[in-house]
């Protein structure tokens, strides 16, 4: 145990020395959030979906005319390039309905163009929202264990970095198999991958916000658990005989102040998470729709390839089939991760901890604060529903999966009916 503690302190010291001076202030989780926030803003600007910038002189986000011109140029070039490719493939008959990856790419092009319009229209609202969030003040006031911080950080990396990396490797294997000229492999892969990355950027921003919100909820619950244990212990017969009423009243007042502070942080995090959803709801709904269509179309094309192999004795490429399965598994994995982190596990945990308080011999002010905190948890009703259509929780995965399976069964039944009617 001592060895692990020494190694942890050593890694933390190396981490502190490797950071730029601007990132060294604050606690470990604040430093990680600062770095991730800088990276997110940079990527949003690079892809042209964000028209603002952070002013170090004014210490807030501001609208930028220069970045607006840059974003217009990026979006125009992006739209012209992919619209010309789509038109060229339609006019020459190169678009094949069995090319799942190509059609999925062009569906994400539509999502990208829609995201450009919606994000530009909401730029001023987003900037006002960013400037109104005292994020680092809240983070610095919380004590979060390094294990929880790194777990959340790795979970975010899995969604934002490793899933696109798996998709990119899959596309390289796919294009090396389907395109003979090796010099065009990287160009084709990049052309296919870019819409997938840009269309997913807004969703990644919301996912990062949920990771951060869960981090704050976990810290609040950890502190709340300690308060529950101490408050219930102060009301035990042994402690009531051991301490005078004045000491217990003073301690209950101190615990009430701590609960008041936790209630403010909980309310701030829950309300801002729900408010941030309105900036990304259209992108999330469209992405889920495209993923549903892509998964259904990919599974149906796999069925057609297998049916042609066994019924019409056509060749079946097992390697391309495996590559396609991996490619379609990535968006489904991303959906599972979003549904899992959006589940109200931590907020329900807050309500359960508040119900554990024994208020029989507690101070009047402490009772009032506990009841107010409980009322806040109940009235906020922390449910994330983009456009009010579907709630983001674990049941969303079952709904998407059942929808894909239902559509797939209808298509397979129609195809089998057509095949055997022709015979």
From Swiss-Prot:
Sites carrying sugar chains: 343, 393
An example Gene Ontology biological process: monoatomic ion transmembrane transport
Tissue expression per record: In larvae, is expressed in neurons of the terminal external chemosensory organ.
Pfam family, one: 7tm_7
GO MF term set: ligand-gated monoatomic ion channel activity
Cell location: Cell membrane
Membrane protein topology class: Multi-pass membrane protein
Keyword Transmembrane appears in the UniProt entry: yes
Keywords associated with the record: Cell membrane, Glycoprotein, Membrane, Receptor, Transducer, Transmembrane, Transmembrane helix
Cytoplasmic side: 1-31, 87-99, 174-200, 300-317
Function description: Probable gustatory receptor which mediates acceptance or avoidance behavior, depending on its substrates.
Protein name: Putative gustatory receptor 97a
UniProt lineage: Eukaryota, Metazoa, Ecdysozoa, Arthropoda, Hexapoda
Originating gene: Gr97a
């Amino acid at each position: 145990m001592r060895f692990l503690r020494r190694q942890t302190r050593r890694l933390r010291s190396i981490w502190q020395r490797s950071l730029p001076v601007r990132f060294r202030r604050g606690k470990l989780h604040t430093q990680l959030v600062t770095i991730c926030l800088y990276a997110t803003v940079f990527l949003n600007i690079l892809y042209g979906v964000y028209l603002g910038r952070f002013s170090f002189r004014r210490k807030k986000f501001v609208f930028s005319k220069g970045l607006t011109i840059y974003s217009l140029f990026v979006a125009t070039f992006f739209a012209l390039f992919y619209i010309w490719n789509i038109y060229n493939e339609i006019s020459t008959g190169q678009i094949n309905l069995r090319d799942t990856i190509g059609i999925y790419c062009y569906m994400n092009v539509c999502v990208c163009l829609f995201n450009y319009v919606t994000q530009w229209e909401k730029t001023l609202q987003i900037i006002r929202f960013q400037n109104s969030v005292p994020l680092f003040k809240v983070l610095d006031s919380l004590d979060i264990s390094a294990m929880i911080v790194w777990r959340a950080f790795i979970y975010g990396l899995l969604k934002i970095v490793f899933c696109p990396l798996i998709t990119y490797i899959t596309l390289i294997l796919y294009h090396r198999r389907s395109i003979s000229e090796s010099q065009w492999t990287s160009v084709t892969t990049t052309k296919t991958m870019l819409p997938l990355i840009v269309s997913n950027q807004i969703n990644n921003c919301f996912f990062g916000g949920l990771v951060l919100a869960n981090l704050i909820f976990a810290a609040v619950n950890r502190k709340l658990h300690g308060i529950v244990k101490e408050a219930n212990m102060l009301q035990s017969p042994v402690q009531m005989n051991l301490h005078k009423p004045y000491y217990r009243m003073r301690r209950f007042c101190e615990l009430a102040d701590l609960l008041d502070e936790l209630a403010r942080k909980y309310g701030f995090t829950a309300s801002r998470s729900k408010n941030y959803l309105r900036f990304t709801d259209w992108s999330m709904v469209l992405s889920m729709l495209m993923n549903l269509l892509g998964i259904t179309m990919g599974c149906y094309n796999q069925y057609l390839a297998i049916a042609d192999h066994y019924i019409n004795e056509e060749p079946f490429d097992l390697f391309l089939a495996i590559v396609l399965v991996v490619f379609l598994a990535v968006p489904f994995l991303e959906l599972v991760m979003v549904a899992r982190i959006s589940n109200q596990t931590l907020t329900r945990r807050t309500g359960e901890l508040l119900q554990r308080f024994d208020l029989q011999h507690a101070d009047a002010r402490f009772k009032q604060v506990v009841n107010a905190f409980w009322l806040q948890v109940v009235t906020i009703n922390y449910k994330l529903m983009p456009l009010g259509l579907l709630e983001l929780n674990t049941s969303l995965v079952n709904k998407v999966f059942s929808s894909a399976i239902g559509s797939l069964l209808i298509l397979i039944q129609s195809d089998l009916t057509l095949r055997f009617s022709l015979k």
